[in-house]
Amino acid sequence: MRLHDLRPVPGSRQKPTRKGQGIGSGLGKTAGRGQKGQKARSGGGVRPGFEGGQMPLYRRLPKRGFHNKFAKEIIAINVDRLNKFEDGTVVTPELLLETGIIKKIGDGVKILGGGELKKALTVKAHAFSESAKEKITAAGGQAEVL
């Protein structure tokens, strides 16, 4: 079997409806849009959130909060994610990024104490929780703050 031999399962694909193709098609003339009105026109229709002139929900509800432009984006991961590495590995934020454990470093990486660590690793990160430090040292490794 080759790629050009592949065919869809019979009945799995329908032909697209061709609207406005004559009265006999059942979708001629107005093409399923009804008679006149805003929704019958090209480009017609109301924007998302429009409620027919009634005060829309997004304006009835109060504003809340603000965006803190000084907020630090700390990427947190649990110690059990570090079991992926071999014994004796020096785990850095760059290595975590390369292996796909984190998507970006942001303003720092913090190691949290979720799960169990079974490998003796030297972990270098910007911050550690107390339980994470204990688990890393208990497994025979070191926790170094960058």
From Swiss-Prot:
- Superkingdom, taxonomy of origin: Bacteria
InterPro entries tied to this protein:
Ribosomal_uL15 (IPR030878), Ribosomal_uL15/eL18 (IPR021131), Ribosomal_uL15/eL18_sf (IPR036227), Ribosomal_uL15_bac-type (IPR005749), Ribosomal_uL15_CS (IPR001196)
Q: Where is this region: Disordered?
A: 1-56
GO BP annotations of the record are: translation
Q: Which NCBIfam families match?
A: rplO_bact (TIGR01071)
Its quaternary organisation is: Part of the 50S ribosomal subunit.
User: What does this protein do, in the record's words?
Assistant: Binds to the 23S rRNA.
By sequence similarity, the record places it as follows: Belongs to the universal ribosomal protein uL15 family.
Protein name per its UniProtKB record = Large ribosomal subunit protein uL15
- What species is given as this protein's source? Carboxydothermus hydrogenoformans (strain ATCC BAA-161 / DSM 6008 / Z-2901)
